[in-house]
């Protein structure tokens, strides 16, 4: 059977992929942007020179919008997954204070380190992480998902799957429009 696909790497997507990988599912994680280390350079270039990379910026890339802006990464304190999320972030380098603070705050520097650590664990568990890969279409057969159409660095390809989790950020308007049209 085809592996499950998680679309979006920040931070909900990697945490979803982690849960799947720990169950032995070996998911594929697709992210249109770049890893946080490369993305940091693109963001700095934008802030200093005004050069915008439309796929790797404050909105797109590993860690999502919250990776470069305080207050964007939130977890509801009454959410059932709250403890899992915070424990995983602490386990990957976030400050322990987020486990007991009324308004948990990770901070950009800690979040970047946690994202890199989380990515390493995902790779060790067999997750196939594909940066620079944007979902451009879906294939439905009899009303059920059978494949994702993907644009990657080497061009377009079809990724067969019957299971996909969309962990899209707030700026993936083109993807939302594509899904609505499908």
Language-model segments: residues:
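Residues forming the flavin
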Residues: 1-92, 96-182
